[in-house]
Amino acid sequence: MVAQITEGTAFDKHGRPFRRRNPRPAIVVVAFLVVVTCVMWTLALTRPPDVREAAVCNPPPQPAGSAPTNLGEQVSRTDMTDVAPAKLSDTKVHVLNASGRGGQAADIAGALQDLGFAQPTAANDPIYAGTRLDCQGQIRFGTAGQATAAALWLVAPCTELYHDSRADDSVDLALGTDFTTLAHNDDIDAVLANLRPGATEPSDPALLAKIHANSC
């Protein structure tokens, strides 16, 4: 009995040969799964990244009995990308709190100073006093402050840009309710490094375009 089990046989008890298993269905299933997996990976790798659109800022409140508040002319992202950013030590930035979160302007001003911006100040936003700026925020500047605005825009790339009538080179960063922290990645760091004292290489226009194409 043991010998028969050990030796085995190719026939059943009626003397008929055992049927061999057909491997074709298993091969078909495996091939199908391989194809499906390849298609899924191809779609995942070739799909363009989702680009988050920043919320449009609400207009400023209009005080009764006074002239309407004018933010200035909104500047397009395309036009601003062509502006070369200023050296960080030459910047004059005012961080304005319009988010309703106490102390946020001071925190962001400190973070800007850590990056190399020259002694940013912090205060409440007089334009949105008594209300909140429901968006990422706004960068407001005059003609003399365009380069500073371009440097500031590197770390606040989702803000709206407004060219106003101020004559000096100061720039306001008004923080909205959606603003959480300054932007940070390897490309931004590379550009900021070229804007610090001692740097001799100019900012790379292609890198600037890449930063602002992928931010919002």
UniProtKB/Swiss-Prot annotation:
The keyword Ion transport does not apply. The keyword Phosphoprotein does not apply. Keywords: Cell membrane, Membrane, Transmembrane, Transmembrane helix, Virulence. One of its GO terms (cellular component) is membrane. It is a single-pass membrane protein. InterPro entries: LytR/CpsA/Psr_C. The chain crosses the membrane at residues 25-45. Gene3D superfamilies: 3.30.70.2390. Disruption phenotype: Loss of the gene results in increased sensitivity to nitric oxide (NO) and lower growth rates at low densities in rich media. The mutant has substantially increased sensitivity to two distinct antibiotics that inhibit peptidoglycan cross-linking (vancomycin and meropenem) and to rifampicin. It also shows increased cell envelope permeability. The mutant is highly attenuated in mice. Pfam families: LytR_C (PF13399). It comes from the Bacteria. It is found in: Cell membrane. Contributes to cell envelope integrity and virulence. This is Cell envelope integrity protein Cei.
